[in-house]
A protein has these predicted regions:
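Sec-dependent signal peptide recognition
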Residues: 1-7
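Hydrophobic h-region of N-terminal signal peptides that target proteins for export
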Residues: 7-17
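Betabetaalpha-Me/HNH-type nuclease active-site subdomain
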Residues: 18-96
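C-terminal, well-folded lobe of enzymatic/effector domains
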Residues: 21, 82-83, 92-209
Length: 209
């Protein structure tokens, strides 16, 4: 029985809080389709990100330091927290200053970088991945296989291989595209605990608001 419990626990993703900053294996760049997040979460919160004046599509959820199994979080760091100006300057790609702050606190502290350098690296990673333009052309909600979203990203980014990208779903909606990158932001294969491809054949994909 004890061996069974050990096996089950060892198979679960590992969250290592309070790890030393800068000690990790690679990054996960997480891109969220804003209209779908608004439909499942943001509207209920009254999030400003979901107002039509913003025209958000694929936004940066975060750049996450990752182990080959598990991930660090809320690390000890000698660097100061970001200023309000720094987090506001990330709104154009992250949707809100609040998200930028949370991402620094949970993930940025584990990068070993200052807040300014972490945000700069996050922006660089976001900019180097081409977000497929086809999704911005939708004029109505559609249902599609999650594999179609993955194929669109692979076509738009020839340097990516299928094992370097995963598409996630939540509550029947396409949720995120997650790309695995080295510390130098070169595409790398994802760990087994990151590859969780959505298998839905009819995932909802909402248009830009």
């Amino acid at each position: 029985m004890r061996w069974l419990v050990f096996w089950v626990l060892s198979a679960l993703p590992v969250l290592a809080e309070g790890e030393k900053a800068g000690e990790f294996d690679y990054y996960v760049l997480s891109l969220s389709w804003s209209p779908n997040w608004c439909a499942t979460t943001g509207d209920a919160r009254g999030s400003e990100q979901c107002e039509t004046r913003h025209d958000y599509g694929w936004i940066l959820h975060g750049l996450w330091p990752q182990f080959h199994q598990g991930w660090p979080a809320y690390c000890r760091t000698p660097h100061s927290a970001p200023s309000r100006r720094m987090t506001r300057e990330m709104e154009d790609i992250q949707g809100s200053a609040g998200l930028a702050w949370h991402q620094w606190k949970k993930h940025g502290t584990c990068s070993g970088l200052s807040a300014a350098d972490y945000f700069a690296l996050s922006r660089k990673a976001y900019d180097q991945i081409t977000r497929p333009a086809v999704f911005r052309k939708l004029d109505r909600s559609v249902k599609l296989p999650a594999s179609v979203v993955e194929e669109a990203f692979l076509k738009a980014n020839p340097d990516l291989e299928p094992d370097m990208l995963t598409i996630t779903c939540r509550d029947g909606y396409i949720e995120e595209a997650r790309v695995c990158l080295s510390k130098d932001l070169n595409p790398v294969p994802c760990g087994r605990d990151v590859i969780r491809d959505c298998r839905l054949e009819g995932a909802v994909f909402d248009p830009i608001r």
